[in-house]
Amino acid sequence: MNFNNELSDLKNRFLFRTLRAQKCSDVARDRIDFFIWELKFLNCFLHLQSFAFASECGMLDISQKMIEICKRFNTPPPHNSFAYWKEVICKRLCAISIQPDASSDDGFACWKKVIWKTKQEFRAKYSFPKTLLADNKVYDDDDTNPKFVMEFIDAVVGNLNVLVKINDPSSLLFVPGPKEQIEQVLKELKLLRFFVCFVSNKCIEPQYQHTTFYTHALIEASHIAMVVWLNLPIYGNRNQDLASSEVSCLLSDFMEMKIKSIQPDISRNNIYIDVLRALKSTIPQAQDKHAAESGIVETPTHNLMVGLSDQMANLQEMLCLLRDNLIHLPILDLEFHLQDMDSVIVDAGLLIYSLYDIKGQKEDTTLEDINQALGFDLPRNIEPIKAMINLVMQKAFQCNLPRIHGLGYVDFLLKNLKDFQGRYSDSLDFLKNQLQVIQTEFESLQPFLKVVVEEPHNKLKTLNEDCATQIIRKAYEVEYVVDACINKEVPQWCIERWLLDIIEEITCIKAKIQEKNTVEDTMKTVIARTSSKLARTPRMNEEIVGFEDVIENLRKKLLNGTKGQDVISIHGMPGLGKTTLANSLYSDRSVFSQFDICAQCCVSQVYSYKDLILALLRDAIGEGSVRRELHANELADMLRKTLLPRRYLILVDDVWENSVWDDLRGCFPDVNNRSRIILTTRHHEVAKYASVHSDPLHLRMFDEVESWKLLEKKVFGEESCSPLLKNVGLRIAKMCGQLPLSIVLVAGILSEMEKEVECWEQVANNLGSYIHNDSRAIVDKSYHVLPCHLKSCFLYFGAFLEDRVIDISRLIRLWISEAFIKSSEGRRLEDIAEGYLENLIGRNLVMVTQRSISDGKAKECRLHDVLLDFCKERAAEENFLLWINRDQITKPSSCVYSHKQHAHLAFTEMHNLVEWSASCSFVGSVVLSNKYDSYFSTRDISSLHDFSISRILPNFKFLKVLDLEHRVFIDFIPTELVYLKYFSAHIEQNSIPSSISNLWNLETLILKSPIYALRCTLLLPSTVWDMVKLRHLYIPDFSTRIEAALLENSAKLYNLETLSTLYFSRVEDAELMLRKTPNLRKLICEVECLEYPPQYHVLNFPIRLEILKLYRSKFKTIPFCISAPNLKYLKLCGFSLDSQYLSETADHLKHLEVLILYKVEFGDHREWKVSNGKFPQLKILKLEYLSLVKWIVADDAFPNLEQLVLRGCQDLMEIPSCFMDILSLKYIGVEYCNESVVKSALNIQETQVEDYQNTNFKLVLIEFSLQKKAWKLNLTDAEDMHNAVKNILAEIR
């Protein structure tokens, strides 16, 4: 109805006018809504006045009555009284808009009374008609076309919806009492509308063939409209209950189909049956439209014979399943079944409407009686409906599956199948045989999946990956069907059919594999190259290649030039290497040694001002001195004061807008000491805006020589390319369009291939000329050649924010929880995942930003912006991952009806998660990232609480990963999400519910507290020890306790590897806990004891323990000596130790590589003696804020030490001279120590560099007091060191 749009515009104009005059009251708004409601119904009736059938419906009688009432009010009678009332109401709307104040009644009460009395007189002459059209009365009217009928029904439904939604008793549109009957009428009208739509869409003959049906539908809708308009709302009736009962009676006539035909043999059902039979005869030629009009199958089952109650209940359940799944199914998934679908829908309609016409129904009517009366076999007629429902349900589920999968999903399923059958034996008993067959089939396919991972370059790679994808998709289906069975969401007959289909499809997949002999060949052949691709650990060569002239020019600007502050701006397109070039200059020893302070930050498109300041402060003054709880402006002032007296070098990377520079420039004071700022950006305008003295540098493209040099370096490292490959290599380098990022990505492809001319020629041919200046094409090619087990891992980077460093331990835990990692006998999943990551690093798809000094493993990484954008876009295309950003993504409703439910969702806003929750039933993971401040203060925290999440999480029933670590504070743990494997969040409560054991799949549990909160105790329930799959229990901000009496009778957690932070008040408790966790690898705990119990003088930690952190709670003495044969990392905090204790500890820790002593006291003598041979494998020694005065170290101690860090050791006399002779030493850092420590550090460097020619040695001195002068020195160059040592030693002396 076009008039509805006119009314909407009219209403908006009135509201705008009243708001301009003065604030529109709620009463005025309600009056406007009331008149709009009346106008919409009147408009509907106006459209019906000219119908030839109107006289039979009583319409004209009512119109005549309205004319009489007009005369009574001395108003000239209009030709059409409905039009008259429409005009009157429009005038009243104008009156309200002029005087919107509720106190200015302006005769409204009088008009309301007139309208109500008018309706009363109408009702006195009007009764709900008991007749339908006779068979021989068919009216050929243009307005009975299906489009008009559907619009008319939509208008009536819209007005009824208004009444249902209003719950305010003071509203003029409020309907008292239960509204179930109105809602049921709404359902009936929607059904009728679906029916009209279905007939219209499927009809291939002229529409007038079904005029009887369309006219009947219009009559029913018009009478419902008349009943509602005349009787509701009941604002003018004192006896509202009586009016409500009268309306209920009238609506019941419609509901119970008491509209009888003039001719006894014609009924509403006859009309429906006739039109369905006509459609059935033309189905083969019907239009191929979406079958979503299957809403017609939502037929009510009231008023049916008692004998059909059970059969009809089953039928109704089937039809609901069909409808619910059809509306979420794309037409492409049914393109070969549309005719069958139409046939089933029509048959269902025929079946139901036939059942209404059976005469003489009795209480004891049997199924045989019904079949005889209907003339067909009811159960047999239902079978095609079952078959179609089964097909549609499977298609509806399959269309939501991602096209990229983790090959570890079968491992997860096989474990769960066993657990499910044990936990839910009653629910799954009837499926026992099918589940055993499925389990056996999946187990038989495990060797094949192993081959897919270990032989990614197999000649049958495409076939293998296609089969692997099909296998994983079947695993998803089995999981869904089993869950649906347990929760009784799908009927038993459907589940049985579905599992049988799955078994048949798995058999077909196996036959396909066996046909190509892939399984037999790989099982019988000794694989020479097994998992070499997983085990290798390539290192990224950080040495920059090319741009020699640019680097030299920029180096001069940094070291020479103006005495004032200068900004060196570098701009250019993505992928040119701006960040790599800037980092190369920033870390150039000839550059940074000339500056007192060096600091850097990365901005990116979405940034946090506070985060930027914090990053700069951490570099400028050290992590320990940064006060994160301060406001951003206070931190900025701290940074400015820190830089003020120094010569500084600042790197500001990836600036997108001028406003960023406006925010930061005030932090960088100019005191004419040649301080420099390097700024990179994609935009020339930003570079020009930030420039001070030097002109912005537009970074050029590579030339052909540089392109080949970079390609050769990335593929061959320090080796040279063979002459046979050089020609094709030069051609490939040229194809990369002189873009460094493209060259690096192509090098990643070549490095994975055999060094043969044929292979390289194939790459050159596949790349083609189209890749010039198109880095996306290169990324796509790099992605295409990835083995399938790495594709999911790579795309998962799309869940992270741009320009953010990614913690690799967290990334690997997420990969494992997402089932991306395929298990391999005898290997830890973490080790396999590290191999996957190193493979991606070796392909130049992932950049390492930090590696562990002790073992060289990557600790942090990031992606180039171009690669990250690719991951987000491709992941969305593959139904794999969708990044939900408030500024970029439309409302979830659009996604619901495009039928894409992605496997993984990444959010930046809590409200986005709430909005999308109802649309994400199949989602497997939710990651909520924080794009603003990384650190929260008490001023920020109130906006971060969102306990509404507890109400929406049950919608994510298949959730396996829920990572809320970076944004949300919750007051609950979602114990109903039984599939959950990874859960991370901030909490404020001091206990964990015992129901946490419901999360029997949970492998990683990370709970943190607000940074502003004081450290408190968190009680662990004994049921935690029932969670046998738990691998990482990380609760760092609490003192976690569990009663020893409860622990004694609990099970062992054999899979637990990480435990933090547990509190022990007795050594006995610690010993008991260690027995219950025999495979721990990382333990962080607090201890509180007074003395050594003799029986616990040596506490034996688990043999696999590698990381141990011990914190003092109250008493300073450690009540045990540590014995951990494979311990590599030890941190002791707050204890009082002596040389004997540390000597005994060293004897038990032969493999220790990292030792950190923090705020440790050394007794009355404040002395530490380290004897010969102690700490033989130690690589890193950090001493922080110790009370140590005298440190004596034997010549043969610390023989493999590489790093020595002293921080805040103000009383230490000196660093022992034996460190001069440790040839493995590479680094000494001295922060906030006295002058004697600095002097000894300088002497050590002088000996290391000059005497032993240790060119890798590096000394960093930060913030020590020397004649009231603050210093930060970063010395590595021999000449710089020589001059600095001479000058500083001279001052010290």
Swiss-Prot record:
SUPFAM superfamilies, sorted: L domain-like, P-loop containing nucleoside triphosphate hydrolases
Intrachain disulfide bonds: none
Chain coiled-coil ranges: 423-446, 538-560
Record-level Gene Ontology MF annotations: ADP binding; ATP binding
Predominant localisation class: cytoplasm
NB-ARC domain boundaries: 539-826
GO BP: plant-type hypersensitive response
Compartments where found: Cytoplasm; Membrane
GO cellular component terms listed in the entry, alphabetical order: cytoplasm; membrane
Entry superkingdom: Eukaryota
Record-linked InterPro entries: Apaf_helical, Disease_R_plants, LRR_dom_sf, NB-ARC, P-loop_NTPase, R1A-like_N, RX-like_CC, WH-like_DNA-bd_sf
UniProt similarity note: Belongs to the disease resistance NB-LRR family.
Function: Confers resistance to late blight (Phytophthora infestans) races carrying the avirulence gene Avr1. Resistance proteins guard the plant against pathogens that contain an appropriate avirulence protein via an indirect interaction with this avirulence protein. That triggers a defense system including the hypersensitive response, which restricts the pathogen growth.
Name of the featured protein: Late blight resistance protein R1-A
Organism: Solanum demissum (Wild potato)
